[in-house]
Swiss-Prot record:
Protein known as: Uncharacterized HTH-type transcriptional regulator YvzC
Top-level taxonomy: Bacteria, Bacillati, Bacillota, Bacilli, Bacillales
Signal peptide stretch: none
Primary residence: cytoplasm
Domain HTH cro/C1-type residues, every copy: 13-67
GO MF entry, a single one: DNA binding
Cellular localization per UniProt: Cytoplasm
Disulphide bridges: none
Length: 77
């Protein structure tokens, strides 16, 4: 049975960090999340919750589909 999993467009965030010379800690502080949370979301270790999604969309001034996407995971295997 496929389950939707929200994923971040990691390449966008990493390129933003390079372009703006931001460390992960600096970006997390700007967004308003902990560095550990941002790291885990970017590495796919944690799904972003509503609060993190909202803060990131607000910070980047993007629509959901521009920063996140749905990945379908088969839970039956």
């Amino acid at each position: 049975m496929p389950v939707e999993k929200i994923q971040i467009r990691r390449d966008y965030v990493l390129q933003y960090m390079v372009n703006n010379d931001y460390s992960l800690n600096q970006l997390a502080l700007e967004i308003g999340v902990s560095p550990a949370t941002l790291s885990r979301v970017l590495n796919g270790e944690r799904r972003p919750g509503q609060l993190v999604i909202g803060k990131m969309l607000h910070y980047f001034n993007l629509k959901f589909e521009d920063l996140f996407y749905y990945d379908f995971v088969d839970k039956s295997q």
